[in-house]
Regions:
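A short helix-loop-beta-strand connector motif used in the catalytic cores of GNAT acetyltransferases and
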Residues: 54-65
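Acyl-donor (CoA/ACP) binding surface of acyl/acetyltransferases
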Residues: 1-36, 63-172
Length: 172
């Protein structure tokens, strides 16, 4: 999964590689609300920065475009980053216009599930600032739990994904 996903589709989005033509749209959705929370993004984030990010995508750091259901409008970015051994980190940001509409939850869940299916036994983690309540809530909705450990980035806490069991036991 350190290679770009060829294609993933959900009910409301398509997840594809980022293309060179995406530079302007990527710069547009990467506003101050994003750059203030993502430590490696410069502010302001320009088209040149977008091109540099896309040029560096590959190998251990892969950035995926989250597009609308038609596959046209860029609504967000999901990064998959290989860490040590069989550990992968996910990160994401979404355009202000789609926040609060469930698009991020749907897209991040799809990527995490595809990653887990393609890498049996891998560990999937995310780092989240404790004050970023919306991001923490998204991660919890899709199965991430707090590890109680600090992340590698300043002020971040490490969360780990736990697959939902394939069965359920009801006790009456």
């Amino acid at each position: 999964m350190t290679d770009t996903l060829l294609a993933l589709s959900t009910d409301h989005c398509r997840i594809t590689p980022l293309f060179a033509d995406d530079a302007r749209a990527l710069a547009a959705i990467t506003d101050e609300t994003v750059t203030s929370r993502v430590h490696f993004l410069p502010a302001p984030f320009t088209e040149a920065d977008a091109r540099a990010l896309m040029a560096g995508s590959g190998g251990g750091d892969v950035f995926h475009a989250v597009r609308d259901a038609r596959g046209l409008d860029l609504n967000g970015v999901i990064g998959v980053h290989r860490r040590v051994g069989q550990e992968y980190e996910i990160g994401y940001w979404f355009a202000a216009r789609v926040r609060g509409k469930g698009i991020a939850t749907e897209a991040v869940r799809a990527v995490v599930e595809a990653l887990a299916a393609s890498r049996p036994g891998c560990s999937i983690v995310a780092e989240c600032h404790p004050d970023n309540e919306r991001s923490r809530a998204l991660l919890r909705r899709i199965g991430f739990v707090s590890t109680g450990r600090a992340g590698k980035r300043p002020g971040r806490m490490l969360m780990a994904w736990r697959a939902a069991p394939a069965y359920r036991i009801d006790v009456c």
